[in-house]
């Protein structure tokens, strides 16, 4: 039985599948996600996110293709997400964190996560830091309470880094730019599609350095550190998130300094 912590991700692979789009997937209890399978040589591959808000326990997945049925069990382990109270100005809240600015971001997020390249651009580890000298401020999954108001809180969907203004922000892995622009909520933002449903998101930058359609390599600059949009830290820097499909996930296992895998494992291919 595979195990994965809340907020993490794993992969499902198969052989002898000519039409991966015909794979039927169900899960009990629900994972609130239907994976997309992509061709990788003789294999089909799906990256499966485990949302941080799910309940720990055993999830029984059933996959049907043609006349074949396979049942897989996934052990979802609990994870203790810490909480922080952050004080931000009323100006910051009223300008950048409103129902309107969040809705505008959600619209873009929904559009971007609806599709992904069927080419796997990523390989090996993802960068654990956006630049030399970056300081990790707050990690994935932390509950952020704003100004002590428990009715105004959110779960950090990525990792916050402090960096001097203007420092180049580096792409975490190879991919293609699918968004480069500015939103009130995220500020200057770039989104890179790494293929197979995996994307990285770069918020709060001073400016972007790439355009939609640009191919980037791991370590290429996508923008510069700044503090645009809604910023819940007292410095310049960048917020970096990773998503699989429409779920934001913890990137740590894919980082080059991970104590575990250090990359996205495609079972049967990369393990």
Predicted regions mapped to residue ranges:
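Short, well-structured beta-strand-loop connectors
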Residues: 168-178, 210-225
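Cationic-aromatic interfacial patches
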Residues: 1-80
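Catalytic cores of extracellular degradative/oxidative enzymes
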Residues: 154, 159-164, 197, 208, ...
């Amino acid at each position: 039985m595979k195990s994965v912590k809340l907020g993490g991700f794993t992969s499902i692979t198969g052989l002898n599948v000519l039409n991966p789009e015909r794979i039927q997937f169900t899960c009990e209890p629900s994972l609130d996600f239907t994976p997309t399978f992509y061709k990788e040589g003789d294999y089909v591959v799906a990256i499966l996110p485990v949302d941080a808000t799910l309940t720990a326990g055993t999830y029984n997945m059933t996959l049907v293709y043609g006349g074949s049925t396979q049942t897989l069990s996934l052990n979802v382990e609990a994870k203790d997400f810490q909480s922080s109270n952050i004080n931000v100005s009323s100006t910051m809240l009223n300008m950048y964190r409103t129902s309107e600015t969040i809705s505008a971001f959600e619209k873009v997020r929904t559009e971007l996560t609806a599709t992904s390249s069927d080419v796997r651009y990523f390989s090996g580890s993802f960068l654990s830091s956006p630049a030399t000298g970056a300081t990790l401020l707050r990690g994935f999954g932390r509950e952020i309470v704003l100004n002590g108001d428990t009715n105004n809180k959110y779960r950090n969907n990525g990792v916050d880094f402090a960096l001097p203004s203007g420092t180049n922000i580096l792409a975490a892995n190879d991919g293609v730019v699918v968004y480069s622009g500015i939103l009130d909520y995220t500020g200057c933002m770039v989104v890179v599609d790494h293929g197979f449903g995996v994307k990285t998101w770069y918020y709060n930058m001073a400016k972007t350095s790439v355009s939609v359609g640009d191919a980037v390599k791991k370590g290429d600059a996508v923008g510069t550190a700044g503090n645009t949009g809604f910023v819940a830290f007292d410095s310049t820097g960048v917020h970096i998130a990773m998503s699989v499909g429409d779920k934001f996930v913890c990137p740590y296992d894919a980082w080059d300094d991970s104590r575990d895998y250090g990359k996205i494992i495609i079972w049967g291919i990369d393990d």
